[in-house]
Design a protein with these regions (language model features):
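The N-cap/first-turn positions of alpha helices
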Residues: 2-5, 29, 59, 66
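Short alpha-helical "packing" element that flanks the helix-turn-helix/winged-helix DNA-binding module
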Residues: 5-12, 62
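Short helix-boundary/capping micro-motifs
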Residues: 12-26
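Alpha-helical residues within the helix-turn-helix
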Residues: 23-24, 41, 60
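Residues within the DNA-recognition helix of helix-turn-helix
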Residues: 28-38
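A short LG(V/I)-centered, amphipathic sequence patch enriched
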Residues: 40-57
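Alpha-helical linker/hinge and terminal dimerization helices associated
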Residues: 42-43, 62-84
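Interdomain hinge and pocket-entrance segments immediately C-terminal to HTH DNA-binding domains
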Residues: 81-96
Length: 96
């Protein structure tokens, strides 16, 4: 399981179709389909009903967890960025 697979599934859930998800991810539909299929194979569950384009119950659970993972990664990046760009030093004020 990798982040690209989770991002592809999340995009399908949000966009409503594989082709719309591909446009959102700036890739081709076959890449999105491959990522989702590999994720399904690894988990041993169908995550998207191909006839309707909707998530299965298992897909809903995976997307919910994937969103949390994506949020945590964004938070991690922000924390590290703020540490790297932290302003430090003395501030001196003078009054007359």
């Amino acid at each position: 399981m990798d982040l690209r697979q989770l991002a592809a599934l999340t995009a399908v859930a949000e966009a409503g179709s594989f082709s719309a998800a591909a446009r959102r991810l700036h890739t081709v539909q076959s890449n999105v389909s491959t990522h989702v299929a590999r994720l399904e194979a690894e988990l041993g569950a169908t995550l998207v009903d191909r006839s309707t384009g909707t998530l299965t119950d298992e897909g809903d659970v995976v997307v919910s967890r994937a969103r949390r993972i994506q949020h945590e990664l964004e938070s991690l990046r922000a924390d590290v960025d703020s540490m790297l760009h932290q302003v430090a030093g003395d501030v001196r004020l003078g009054c007359i």
